Amino acid sequence: PGQDFMRF
């Protein structure tokens, strides 16, 4: 959530 890094 907030970033697209490993679907967070």
Curated annotation (Swiss-Prot):
Keywords: Amidation, Neuropeptide, Secreted. Disulfide bonds: none annotated. The modification Phenylalanine amide is found at residue 8. One of its GO terms (cellular component) is extracellular region. Expressed in the CNS and thoracic perisympathetic organs (tPSO) but not in the ring gland, midgut or abdominal perisympathetic organs (aPSO) (at protein level). It is found in: Secreted. GO terms for biological process: neuropeptide signaling pathway. FMRFamides and FMRFamide-like peptides are neuropeptides. Belongs to the FARP (FMRFamide related peptide) family. This is FMRFamide-like neuropeptide PGQDFMRF-amide. It comes from Delia radicum.
